[in-house]
């Protein structure tokens, strides 16, 4: 079971989220059949979305779009406050060579572009916020977004590690944020600790990477666990939802599908589930429009 643990320092100067997103990213890889580089890029974006959604309340939904300049295309993820996230990459079969040490490169793979966050509070008029991709590594781009767009100094680390067969081995990350009222010496102490932290890849390799992350963030400093919540890859598509989408098409288009194709097959981009609509379904839609 994947989870996110929310914590706050005893002094109230900082808060930290730590995540185990292994099954989330593994499910995404299985559904989209992504190559190594696209698995890591999509996985990091899914984790980034889980972090952002954990910061919201109510029925808020967050869409993250990593709009890079490479042949990978856009990475699009959607997360809600109930722990659900879904996502896809436009060209999952695109891949680049690993480094000599076997490292999967993401920054050069994603390229230059924009980090777009769409926040939908469920009341209409979603709020869009855009910052440039500063590295394409996703974690650094999320930290820059939080610092620039939300005016909250943040440190982010996230990664996806693959095994010898390029299958997801472990995935997770962390967010650390300065809270209002933090003293200069507290900020300096935490900044030093973050700078001296082992690489996120090293921490994820630990037997219990959640505890390893918390230890690296807080050291010997006291902190409180505020909550532990389940997170997962979960798509909200359905036959009914796609039926409603078809209903928005002109009757002439529906008639053409009925007569020439004898139905239509639709595949959800987010989870690759396929839905079939036969002539009877299309006839019903046409009749409802008349």
Curated annotation (Swiss-Prot):
UniProt signal peptide: none
HAMAP family: HslO
Official protein name in the record: 33 kDa chaperonin
Gene Ontology annotations for the cellular component aspect, listed alphabetically: cytoplasm
Organism encoding this protein: Streptococcus pneumoniae (strain JJA)
General function of this protein: Redox regulated molecular chaperone. Protects both thermally unfolding and oxidatively damaged proteins from irreversible aggregation. Plays an important role in the bacterial defense system toward oxidative stress.
Cystine crosslinks: 235-237, 268-271
Lineage: Bacteria, Bacillati, Bacillota, Bacilli, Lactobacillales
Main subcellular localisation: cytoplasm
InterPro entries assigned to the protein according to its UniProt record, in alphabetical order: Heat_shock_Hsp33, Heat_shock_Hsp33_C, Heat_shock_Hsp33_N
Family: Belongs to the HSP33 family.
Gene Ontology terms: biological process: protein refolding
Keywords, alphabetical: Chaperone, Cytoplasm, Disulfide bond, Redox-active center, Zinc
Subcellular locations according to the entry: Cytoplasm
Protein modification: Under oxidizing conditions two disulfide bonds are formed involving the reactive cysteines. Under reducing conditions zinc is bound to the reactive cysteines and the protein is inactive.
Record Pfam families: HSP33
GO molecular function, one term: protein folding chaperone
């Amino acid at each position: 079971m994947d989870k996110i643990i929310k914590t706050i320092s005893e002094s109230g100067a900082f808060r930290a989220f730590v995540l185990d997103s292994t099954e989330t990213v593994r499910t995404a890889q299985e559904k989209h059949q992504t190559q190594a580089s696209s698995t890591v890029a999509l996985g990091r974006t899914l984790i980034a979305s889980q972090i952002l959604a954990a910061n919201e309340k109510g029925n808020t939904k967050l869409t993250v779009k990593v709009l890079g300049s490479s042949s990978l295309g856009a990475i699009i993820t959607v997360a809600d406050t109930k722990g659900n996230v879904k996502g896809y990459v436009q060209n999952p079969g695109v891949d680049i060579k690993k480094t000599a040490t076997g490292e999967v490169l993401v920054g050069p793979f994603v390229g230059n572009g924009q980090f777009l966050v769409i926040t939908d509070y469920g009341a209409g008029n979603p709020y869009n916020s855009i910052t440039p991709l500063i590295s394409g590594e996703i974690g650094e781009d999320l930290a820059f977004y939080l610092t620039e767009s939300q005016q909250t100094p943040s440190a982010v680390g996230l990664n996806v590690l693959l095994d010898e067969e390029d299958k997801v081995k472990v995935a997770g990350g962390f967010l650390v944020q300065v809270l209002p009222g933090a003293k200069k010496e507290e900020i300096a102490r935490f900044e030093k600790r973050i700078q001296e932290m082992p690489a996120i890849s090293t921490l994820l390799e630990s037997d219990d990477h959640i505890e390893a992350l918390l230890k690296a963030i807080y050291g010997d400093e006291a902190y409180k666990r505020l909550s532990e919540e389940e997170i997962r890859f979960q798509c909200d598509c359905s036959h009914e939802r796609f039926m409603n989408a078809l209903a928005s098409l002109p009757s002439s288009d529906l008639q053409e599908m009925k007569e020439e194709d004898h139905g239509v097959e639709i595949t959800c981009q987010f989870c690759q589930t396929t839905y079939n609509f036969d002539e009877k379904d299309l006839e019903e839609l046409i009749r409802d429009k008349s």
